[in-house]
């Protein structure tokens, strides 16, 4: 089974890209889709109604959504394989810029909106620097000069990343992405690891302390 993990900030076009991928492959292979979010998500319902594919969603609750993704991904792989899926697409919440949801196997795709600002790639850290592919969306809403600057900023963060631009609603210029998915090897579910290093550790705020100020906190976070 192949694995594709799609990350990116809210409203960047992750679900629109997912729909284009599903539309392209749904008649060739069996697809499963997992959405990880915090409060509410409707993408699973949309994809199931529109394309009739297997879908699930997970709410992270009190966990960071990307930490929750690490916890549930093993079960998701088992679920997809048990349903004879050929491709599992995981769409992250994209809310934790310090974390990277990508694994040592499969394809990691970062979706960036061209209208998010030219400094967005630099601010997103590991979500960009550890991705295999960057898809820049909403290119019809900016000038050619702005697009070139965005590409340059992404290259400064990750020199080897595979770049492509699209209007994800229409799905133009994505043939290379489809080829990369088609050519990607299947995963070995017993040897899946995070590609990057996780954050330093759990701080007192993570475990529920609400007091304001350094004097109330201790451990890995120090002044």
What is each model feature region?
Residues 41-45, 119-124, 146-153:
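Short, glycine/polar-rich helix-capping loops at beta-to-alpha or helix-loop-helix junctions
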Residues 33, 110, 134-136:
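Structural beta-sheet core signal
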């Amino acid at each position: 089974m192949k694995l594709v993990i799609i990350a990116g900030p809210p409203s960047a076009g992750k679900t629109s890209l997912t729909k284009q991928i599903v539309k392209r492959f749904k008649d060739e292979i069996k697809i499963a889709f997992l959405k990880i979010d915090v409060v509410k998500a409707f993408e699973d319902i949309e994809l199931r109604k529109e394309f009739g594919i297997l879908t699930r969603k997970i709410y992270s609750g009190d966990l960071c959504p990307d930490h929750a993704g690490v916890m549930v991904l093993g079960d998701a792989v088992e679920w997809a394989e048990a349903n004879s899926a050929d491709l599992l697409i995981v769409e992250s919440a994209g809310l934790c810029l310090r974390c990277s949801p990508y694994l040592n196997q499969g394809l990691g795709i970062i979706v960036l909106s061209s209208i998010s600002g030219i400094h967005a790639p630099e601010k997103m850290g590991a979500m960009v620097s550890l991705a295999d592919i960057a898809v820049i969306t909403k290119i019809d809403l900016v000038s050619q000069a702005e697009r070139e600057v965005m590409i340059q900023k992404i290259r400064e963060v990750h020199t080897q990343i595979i770049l492509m631009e699209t209007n994800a609603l229409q799905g133009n210029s994505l043939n290379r992405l489809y080829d990369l998915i088609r050519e990607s090897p299947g995963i070995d579910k017993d040897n899946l690891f995070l590609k990057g290093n996780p954050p330093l550790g759990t701080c007192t705020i993570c475990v529920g302390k609400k007091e304001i100020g350094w004097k109330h906190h201790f451990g890995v976070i120090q002044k």
